């Protein structure tokens, strides 16, 4: 996916540059989505739709008079990391907006209840993306979202994979944001940017979205039963775990600026997300197994070695790639555990 970035110079003219980001735009089987039978949990979906329509955060994303001034007070050593966070987050939110909006449009006639839920979530994602993009604009930089929408590239995922992935993504987002907010409440001296003041309410949007996908999965038990689906659940749980941990364990990271220990923060978020997912999934990862933590740390170390070999020949990288693949396989082979006593998502 190519993102057009706009950067204003000291005069009134703008220069444009482009940066290549990893594709994060998805499409799916809309006909299969339209045929979902949610009648067994219709009351739960209607209750959640009522929450969506209440739009509790309608007035939340309003910048106060001191927002820009505080944004410009950021320590120069953290500015690049903050911009990276804003760009990555904005891209992710905009991706969600496009997917949810398209699903809502396609389901409007065949499955109006689901369509209305997706419409409300697309509203939230658009609001988040716009807020993040405006924060980038404080540094004379921002994503050209209209151009991005035209140039987007799609990766096809089956509906059940969309459900697994978005459920975990929204729940991880919730636990990430609330953990950061609570930490900065205790240590306000580490609040390097005013954006973090908004995380307490913001994370509730993420939580409601996660609850919605949890309801979909609970309403379609065939997506959670059987050995093949159980393997897919393990795959997605481990993929999200690895992606987060490997990214957060990089030496120069935003969490240092916030006064957080990146490894401890990542594990706490993963532990909470893992337990939360047990309300929906038939199994969870055994994060308390000492071997799991050892293998996870080993993967993070090997990933850093691999990045250090960037630009080297494939032959030079092969031993590290093989070691990383082997360690990931060992993680996958660790026996999962049963979730805590089952609860309804809502």
From Swiss-Prot:
The keyword Oxidoreductase applies. GO terms for molecular function: iron ion binding; magnesium-protoporphyrin IX monomethyl ester (oxidative) cyclase activity. GO terms for biological process: chlorophyll biosynthetic process; light-independent chlorophyll biosynthetic process; photosynthesis. Its cofactor is Fe cation. Its EC number is 1.14.13.81. It catalyses: Mg-protoporphyrin IX 13-monomethyl ester + 3 NADPH + 3 O2 + 2 H(+) = 3,8-divinyl protochlorophyllide a + 3 NADP(+) + 5 H2O. Pathway: Porphyrin-containing compound metabolism; chlorophyll biosynthesis (light-independent). Keywords: Chlorophyll biosynthesis, Iron, Metal-binding, NADP, Oxidoreductase, Photosynthesis. The keyword Ribonucleoprotein does not apply. It holds the Pfam family Rubrerythrin. It is an enzyme of class 1 (oxidoreductase). Catalyzes the formation of the isocyclic ring in chlorophyll biosynthesis. Mediates the cyclase reaction, which results in the formation of divinylprotochlorophyllide (Pchlide) characteristic of all chlorophylls from magnesium-protoporphyrin IX 13-monomethyl ester (MgPMME). Belongs to the AcsF family. This is Magnesium-protoporphyrin IX monomethyl ester [oxidative] cyclase. It comes from Gloeobacter violaceus (strain ATCC 29082 / PCC 7421). The gene is acsF.
């Amino acid at each position: 996916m190519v993102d057009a970035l706009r950067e204003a110079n000291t005069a009134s003219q703008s220069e444009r540059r482009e940066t290549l980001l990893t594709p994060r735009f998805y499409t799916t089987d809309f006909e299969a989505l339209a045929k979902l039978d949610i009648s067994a949990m219709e009351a739960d979906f209607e209750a959640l739709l009522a929450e969506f329509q209440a739009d509790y955060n309608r007035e939340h994303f309003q910048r106060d008079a001191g927002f820009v001034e505080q944004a410009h007070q950021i320590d120069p050593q953290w500015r690049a990391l903050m911009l990276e966070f804003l760009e990555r987050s904005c891209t992710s939110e905009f991706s969600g907006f496009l997917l949810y909006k398209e699903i809502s449009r396609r389901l409007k006639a065949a499955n109006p209840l689901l369509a209305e839920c997706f419409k409300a979530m697309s509203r939230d994602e658009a609001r988040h993306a716009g807020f993040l993009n405006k924060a980038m604009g404080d540094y004379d930089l921002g994503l050209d979202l209209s151009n991005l929408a035209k140039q987007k590239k799609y990766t096809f995922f089956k509906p059940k994979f969309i459900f697994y992935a978005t459920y975990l993504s929204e729940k991880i987002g919730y636990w990430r944001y609330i953990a950061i907010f609570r930490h900065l409440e205790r240590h306000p001296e580490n609040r390097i940017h005013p954006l973090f003041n908004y995380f307490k309410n913001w994370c509730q949007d993420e939580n409601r979205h996660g609850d919605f996908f949890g309801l979909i999965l609970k309403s379609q038990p065939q997506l959670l039963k059987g050995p093949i689906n159980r393997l897919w659940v393990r795959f997605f749980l481990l993929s999200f775990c690895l992606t987060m941990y490997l990214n957060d364990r990089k030496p120069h990271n935003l969490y240092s600026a916030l006064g957080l220990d990146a490894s401890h923060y990542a594990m706490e978020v993963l532990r909470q997300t893992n337990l939360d997912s047990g309300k929906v999934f038939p199994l969870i990862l055994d994060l308390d197994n000492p071997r799991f933590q050892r293998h996870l740390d080993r993967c993070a170390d090997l990933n850093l070695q691999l990045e250090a070999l960037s630009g080297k020949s494939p032959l030079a990288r092969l031993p590290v790639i093989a070691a990383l693949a082997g360690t990931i396989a060992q993680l996958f082979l660790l026996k999962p555990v049963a979730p805590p006593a089952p609860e309804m998502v809502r």
